[in-house]
Amino acid sequence: PPARRHVILSKVDESIEIEGTKYNLYSNICKNYISDGYKYQESFEKEYMPVFTYKVNDLKITKIICMEYGKNTVCVLYKIQNDGPKAKLTVTPIVNFRDFHTMSTNHEFKIKQDIKSSKVKLVIDEYSNYPVYFYMPNGNYIEHFNDTFRNMYYLEEEKRGFFPEENLAVPGRYEIEIEENSRKRNKLYMFFRGKY
């Protein structure tokens, strides 16, 4: 197997806002808390690639996660079918920069961002030779400062006898406006440059 593998994009959290009410589509586990986005999930497929389908009122979101073969690139495709009022989709990349076999326990991240519209260059913990890039066409990027998701809990790590909690960085979020009674596609690209 390849050596020197790293976790960079841990996950992407989404929420939808309709008529002033926010619905979180993500499900995260902390030691004494589980967020309940799973109640909006209608289906999950994994035959060729992960496909999640969510439904909130009259709005349906299909999320497809793809990776480019032989590259350090992830694409998350969102297909949105809105049969109701205007809405806003928020897409939040949650990142790390650690070896695949370690945990970022009690870690405080140092994030530097270079933002040009919806294109973002991240330098995590001063690894300037290994920048991470995000790009979401039609998304409005909002930078976060010193935003850390603390104590994400991994049940499988605990079952293996390892410490099950770690900190993750939340560098910012994308917001996408969705018109009433509309269909829309949007993509989040994340890629990594550099060699170990």
How should these model regions be labeled?
Residues P1-Y196:
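Terminal accessory carbohydrate-recognition/targeting modules of carbohydrate-active enzymes
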